[in-house]
Design a protein with these regions (language model features):
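Terminal alpha-helical anchor/extension segments at protein ends
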Residues: 1-187
Length: 187
């Protein structure tokens, strides 16, 4: 029986890895403890598994929402660990003098390709006048004014990603109102 199950989970894993290659999403494995153990044994990339849930009930007749509800706690714990790790990275960069929190400096570094990781408080929007030639960003409170970009944060995010960095959105309760953006620089 175990060899059949392992072969079955090996086939499942090949499909999972094919999907993972396209989307790079974290994986939560749901099932009973025995099947989870078999899957982990044959899985090509066990590091992709962020959580396992063996206490979900009625999986045979459960709806998709039932399964989502059963993994929610594990996903929230994973997110919390990512946020704590992000705060650690921010502190480490601050100590190494590789952190910028002033929006003008963040913009300039992002534009120049120096941004490694941009941390942004969810929902943070700021209108500003951007001059790419001078590499300046001037905050304004009138998003409708001529020459004003209503979402300068979106522009910063685009520059960071375009230059090979990444953007991480942080919960509002973790990143404060007075420091809604932080950029860890490459150098």
């Amino acid at each position: 029986e175990s060899s059949y199950l392992k072969e079955f989970f090996n086939q499942v894993d090949k499909s999972v890895q094919e999907l993972w290659g396209e989307h790079k999403m974290p994986l939560v494995v749901v099932g009973d403890a025995k099947n989870i153990a078999y899957y982990k044994e044959v899985c090509d990339r066990p590091d992709n598994i962020i959580a396992t849930v063996s206490n979900a009930t009625h999986l045979d007749d459960g709806s998709a929402q039932h399964i989502v509800d059963s993994v929610q706690e594990a996903v929230e714990e994973y997110r919390a660990s990512l946020h704590q790790a992000a705060l650690g990275e921010i502190d480490k960069a601050r100590g190494a003098n590789m952190l910028q929190t002033d929006l003008q400096e963040v913009y300039r570094s992002a534009f120049q390709g120096a941004g490694e990781t941009l941390y942004v408080r969810r929902g943070y929007i700021q209108s500003a006048k951007i001059d790419e030639k001078a590499q300046t960003l001037s905050v304004t409170n009138d998003p409708a004014a001529e020459g004003v970009t209503d979402d300068a944060i979106g522009e910063v995010i685009e520059h960071v990603i375009h230059n090979g960095g990444k953007a991480v959105f942080m919960p509002q309760d973790i990143m404060s109102e007075d420091q809604p953006i932080s950029l860890v620089t490459r150098y």
